[in-house]
Amino acid sequence: EDGYLLNRDTGCKVSCGTCRYCND
């Protein structure tokens, strides 16, 4: 949602615009 996809590998959200992964 809002240009964000849920990464099932990390369970975090990845921004398609900047390809950023959350490290929480």
Curated annotation (Swiss-Prot):
GO MF annotations, alphabetized: ion channel inhibitor activity; sodium channel regulator activity; toxin activity
Tissue specificity as recorded in UniProt: Expressed by the venom gland.
InterPro entries: LCN-type_CS_alpha_beta_dom
GO CC annotations, alphabetized: extracellular region
Subcellular location: Secreted
UniProt domain LCN-type CS-alpha/beta: residue ranges: 1-24
Domain of life of the source: Eukaryota
Keyword list, A-Z: Ion channel impairing toxin, Neurotoxin, Secreted, Toxin, Voltage-gated sodium channel impairing toxin
First-listed, main subcellular location of the protein, grouped into a coarse class: secreted
Free-text comment on this protein's domains from its UniProt entry: Has the structural arrangement of an alpha-helix connected to antiparallel beta-sheets by disulfide bonds (CS-alpha/beta).
Record family assignment: Belongs to the long (4 C-C) scorpion toxin superfamily. Sodium channel inhibitor family. Alpha subfamily.
Free-text function comment from the UniProt entry: Binds to sodium channels (Nav) and inhibits the inactivation of the activated channels, thereby blocking neuronal transmission. This toxin is active against mammals.
Protein name: Neurotoxin-2
Protein's organism: Hottentotta tamulus (Eastern Indian scorpion)
